[in-house]
A protein has these predicted regions:
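Asp-based, Mg2+/Mn2+-dependent phosphohydrolase catalytic module
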Residues: 1-2, 110, 114-286
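N-terminal helical cap/lid subdomain that shapes the substrate entry/recognition surface
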Residues: 2-89
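Conserved functional loop/turn residues at catalytic and ligand-binding sites
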Residues: 9-12, 48, 99, 121, ...
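Pocket-edge positions in alpha/beta enzyme catalytic cores
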Residues: 33, 41-45, 76, 80-83, ...
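Short, acidic loop-to-helix structural element flanking the phosphoryl-transfer center
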Residues: 76-104, 110, 114, 142
C-alpha cells in the first residue's frame, strides 16, 4: 500500500484561468494597472525565487484589506473557472480502489481547499487535505508533505506536482527522512518541540546541487547533503509546524513525480515530466 499526495493547482485542477482573472482584477480594481499575460502570472507563482506580490502589484507585501480583496476574487473565480484535468477523476478512483491513502498538499489557503474539491466532486476521495496557513508553511517548505506521511498508515509516499516549488518540497522532505533514518530517530519526541532551526522563508538559487552533484538543502546553521551525515539541524527541519512524533516518520520514503498535464514548467532537477498514463504505471497497483 502507498500514500499518494497530490498538489492541487496544475496537478489536480486546471486553475490557470481563475488565477489569471484574480490577479488582473486585483491589478485593475486596486492599483489601476494593465492586465498581465497568463503565462507570466503562472511562471511567477511557481518560481520560489520570485515575490509574486511584488511582480504583480509593485509592492513587497499586502495589507489585510488587499489580501481580503484578492482572496474574495480567488474563491469566486475558482468556483467559476477551475476544472479537473481530464483523466484525474479516474486516476483518483483507481488509487482509492487499490486502498491507497490519498492526500492533497497545496499552497492554496487551507480554508478554501475543501470547498474547491467539493465543487469538483472529488473531496470524498481524499483522506487528508492540507493547505497553507499560519501553522503550516507553503512549499517549497516540506512540512505539509511530512505531516501527511506522519498521518498516513502507509509510509511509502509518492508526491505528484508540476512546479519547482513542488519538486523542492519533495527533495527537502526526502532529505529530512533520510537523515532521520541515518540518525535513528528519537522515539516519543514531538516534532513540534524538536527545534527552531528551520528557515521557512529560504530562497533557492538556480542550481540546487552541490559540486559533486549531490542534492543540497540549506537550513539555518547547517547545509546538508544526501551524502552527508545526519545533523540535529536537519532533524529539526520541519519540527515547528506540525504535530507528530518522530516515530511516525521512521522508515518512511518519499518519491516525487513531475507531471506534465498542468501549467507548471519542469525544472532541470526533475525526471522527464509524466503523462497521466505514465504516472499510473509508476504508482503501480492501479
Amino acid at each position: 500500500m502507498k500514500t499518494v499526495i497530490f498538489d492541487m493547482d496544475g496537478t489536480l485542477l486546471d486553475s490557470s484561468r481563475a488565477i489569471e482573472i484574480s490577479v488582473n482584477n486585483t491589478r485593475r480594481e486596486l492599483y489601476g494597472l494593465a492586465p498581465l499575460q497568463k503565462n507570466f502570472i503562472v511562471r511567477t507563482i511557481n518560481d520560489p525565487n520570485k515575490n509574486a506580490f511584488l511582480e504583480f502589484y509593485g509592492k513587497t507585501e499586502a495589507s489585510a484589506e488587499e489580501l481580503a480583496f484578492f482572496e474574495k476574487e480567488f474563491v469566486s473565480n475558482y468556483r467559476d473557472f477551475a476544472v479537473l484535468y481530464e483523466g484525474i477523476e479516474d486516476l483518483l478512483h483507481s488509487c482509492k480502489k487499490a486502498g491507497f491513502f490519498l492526500a492533497v498538499a497545496s499552497n492554496a489557503p487551507s480554508y478554501t481547499l475543501s470547498a474547491i474539491l467539493e465543487k469538483t466532486g472529488v473531496r470524498r476521495l481524499f483522506d487528508l487535505v492540507v493547505g497553507a496557513n499560519e501553522q503550516m508553511p507553503s512549499k517549497p517548505n516540506p512540512a505539509m508533505l511530512l505531516h501527511v506521511i506522519a498521518r498516513s498508515p502507509h509510509k511509502n509516499a509518492i508526491f505528484l506536482g508540476d512546479s519547482k516549488k513542488d519538486e523542492l518540497a519533495a527533495l527537502r522532505g526526502a532529505e529530512f527522512l533520510q537523515n532521520l533514518e541515518f540518525q535513528g530517530g528519537n522515539d516519543g519526541k514531538s516534532l513540534s518541540s524538536c527545534g527552531e532551526n528551520l528557515n521557512a522563508d529560504e530562497k533557492f538559487g538556480p542550481d540546487d546541487t552541490g559540486a559533486d552533484g549531490a542534492a543540497t538543502l540549506s537550513f539555518k546553521g547547517a547545509k546538508i547533503s544526501a551524502k552527508a551525515e545526519a545533523t540535529e539541524s536537519a532533524q529539526a527541519a520541519a519540527a515547528r509546524y506540525f504535530q507528530a512524533n518522530l516515530a511516525d516518520l521512521r522508515g518512511a520514503k518519499l518519491e516525487y513525480l513531475q507531471v506534465c498535464w498542468g501549467f507548471g514548467e519542469p525544472s532541470k532537477l526533475s525526471r522527464n515530466a509524466l503523462s497521466i498514463a505514465q504516472a499510473r504505471e509508476i504508482i503501480g497497483g492501479i
